[in-house]
């Protein structure tokens, strides 16, 4: 279940997983191994792509209450491995198949099963056969109250080389759109921009009227991709 602002209160079906990648959230965000400030204005999470999926793996996949034979159910394998009481250190593991993620198979097979049958799990689909998956570890360590170090480590558990793209993602929750009530709307849109960085690194300045400015930097002179966190109306609501 995601956000619901439908006229009928159909919380399970109003905001689908297919819509999630193209639709700006109003009240909360999701992501793999994600963190944010306490108001969830500035967010960070990991996206991945195995070269086989039709979409980026930006969030966990699960069945809604009507799709699962035992109700709502996440169909992924992820583990919170470690954390200090203050969250000054956290460690997370996500297991990402090297084959195309079987979204349709999970939905269709579970929908056909009765409540008396076993659930059809991701492992049952065969995508983990021969250990053809990646173990992706995400670690956070605080160097200071507002200085967080991030380490992402991926291991290929399969018998052969396989493609994997790691896409660390920094974004602002959309609180400036015109569909937000004026009393809750941010007076101006925050900004992400590339700035000059030390040799062998790239850096982004994240500027928000309430939060101030933060710097996001990473090792390697890797390409940066910038997008606006807005709803893709042409894809979701063509002709409207």
Where are these regions (language model features)?
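Anionic coordination/interaction segments
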Residues: 1-240
